[in-house]
Amino acid sequence: MAIDGAVSQTAVEAWDKRWATSEGRADWLEPHPAVVAILPELHARAARRVLDLGCGVGRHALLLAEHGFDVEAIDGSLAGLAVVRETAAARGLPVSLHKGLADALPFPDAGFDYVLSWNVIHHGTLGDLGRRLGEIWRVLRPAGLLQATVLSTRDANYGIGRAIAPDTFVIDQVERKGHPHCYCDAAALVGLLTGFDLLTLRYWALKSDASLYRR
């Protein structure tokens, strides 16, 4: 099972609504410490071109641009992209913005040294997650880095809501209505990452899994 267009649109509409208000954006303005921490590694690798996949209101795209990387940022939410555009212009930061989803990235093969996807690719089934990882693999250069988050089966919300596929549930709350979320344990994640070298795997009980992979 894959997410159909109607469900994807429901998710985009929910994020559009959140990003339209300062209150909705408030928790999504500061870069995550794990992303800040990888900056020295990216510089050590002489990474240049980077992709923020599911950029939201741009907290990480802007950080990467501040540190001199050539940043492409993509999101399905026009409201989120508008915030990134306005903030980048105000701060004099070059960020190339694209409207789109993770399932079919509008970029050529092997174009990025680093792909970041924070709280994005688990919106769907495990099949959707695998397809998105395939797209990320396609656009990463050899030895490029992927830093991403997924939901763990240890998450407090695992098993809550309507099961629509293995380890995939829809929670009928206002903010998540129509959003399938898939969950995986470490073994399932390693299986989905066939071809990648797993460099680090960390678990945050209150937030999400965050992992670093090399193509």
List PLM regions with ranges.
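A short glycine-rich, Lys/Arg-flanked "PGG" loop and its adjoining helix->strand segment in the class I
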Residues: 130-142
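Conserved beta-strand/loop positions that form the S-adenosyl-L-methionine
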Residues: 53
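A short acidic, Gly/Pro-enriched loop at the edge of an enzyme's catalytic core
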Residues: 103-115
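Class I (Rossmann-like) S-adenosyl-L-methionine-dependent methyltransferase catalytic domain
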Residues: 1-46, 57-104, 128, 145-215
